[in-house]
């Protein structure tokens, strides 16, 4: 074998023997920035008793990466109109709610947006440096055809849409194309089962295993424990399938975190009055 051939064989052998890069590990925190009181459980769990009420947690999730990144899953809300529509109490700005973790708003590098409803997309403007990650189909629908009829953009705030479009014109929106576990080390994006046009949920690698942040694709632990679809979905069967996928992804069942269940803040280690660490 010639010299060039030997060199190629040795180079390939070294490449094959090189260990794969280890995924970035994250610390994950649930941050409660508000409560909505007396919320009907029948709007959360399909078929639930209409008389049931629950004080639901309004939450963003912080992902602190071992590589120095700081990401949020969802951004909360702060527009005044929603304080008139809902019984909001104990509110602080999401950008202030993360302060006990030593994070300033301009240190947030990314927002992984589960969907474009007002209570999840309404705080993007509070984090001026962040790149927004949203499903491509979700973005295209709610920046376009959804506004051609009166009943196809429920829960979507036009000002939130304009903020995301503005950020896109600045080159700071990434359109996620379906399931994606390769774009960001240690983070996976997964189709969420049609809570909105194309909602998504997020999986995160931590030192204790893989955490799944369901957001509104599973509102409460009860959705997950009773295999009940969420009440607000465009496709109940797809939502149940998404919940099954969450179970397969999470390292342990207790590492699937629902979107609005106040019990999250009783089940995990408290860091401050409004924050628990998911582990």
Which residues are covered by each model-predicted region?
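Bacterial N-terminal signal peptides
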Residues: 2-14
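Metallo-beta-lactamase
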Residues: 22-23, 92-103, 107, 137-191, ...
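Divalent metal-coordination and catalytic microenvironments
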Residues: 28, 63, 74, 108, ...
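Active-site metal-binding loops of divalent metal-dependent hydrolases
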Residues: 33-34, 75-78, 116, 137-138, ...
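Conserved beta-strand hairpin/beta-sheet module of binuclear metal-dependent hydrolase folds
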Residues: 34-96, 201-218
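Active-site metal-binding motif and surrounding structural segment of the metallo-beta-lactamase
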Residues: 88-134
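Short, electropositive alpha-helical surface patch
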Residues: 89-93, 124, 131-135, 189-195, ...
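Cap/insert and terminal regions of metallo-dependent hydrolase folds
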Residues: 91-92, 199-279
């Amino acid at each position: 074998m010639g010299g060039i051939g030997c060199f190629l064989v040795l180079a390939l052998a070294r490449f094959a023997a090189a260990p794969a890069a280890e995924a970035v590990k994250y610390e994950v925190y649930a941050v409660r920035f508000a409560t909505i009181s007396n919320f009907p459980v029948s709007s959360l769990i399909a078929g639930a008793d209409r008389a049931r009420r629950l004080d639901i947690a309004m939450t963003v999730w912080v992902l602190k990466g071992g590589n120095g990144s700081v990401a949020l899953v969802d951004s909360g809300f702060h527009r005044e109109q929603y304080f008139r529509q809902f019984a909001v109490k104990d509110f602080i700005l999401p950008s202030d709610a993360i302060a006990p973790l030593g994070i300033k708003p301009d240190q947030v590098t990314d927002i992984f947006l589960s969907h474009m409803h007002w209570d999840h997309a309404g705080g993007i403007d509070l984090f001026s440096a962040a790149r927004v990650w949203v499903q491509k189909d979700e973005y295209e629908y709610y920046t376009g055809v959804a506004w051609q009829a009166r009943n196809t953009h429920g829960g979507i705030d036009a000002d939130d849409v304009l903020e995301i479009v503005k950020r896109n014109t600045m080159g700071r929106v990434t359109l996620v194309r379906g399931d994606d576990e390769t774009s960001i080390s240690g983070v996976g994006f997964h189709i969420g089962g049609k809570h909105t046009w194309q909602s998504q949920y997020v999986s995160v690698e931590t030192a204790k295993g893989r955490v799944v942040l369901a957001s509104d694709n599973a509102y409460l632990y009860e959705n997950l424990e009773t295999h009940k679809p969420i009440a607000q979905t465009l496709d109940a069967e797809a939502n149940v399938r998404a919940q099954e996928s969450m179970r397969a992804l999470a390292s342990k069942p207790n590492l699937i975190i629902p979107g609005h269940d106040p019990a999250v803040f009783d089940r995990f280690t408290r860091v401050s009055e409004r924050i628990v660490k998911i582990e």
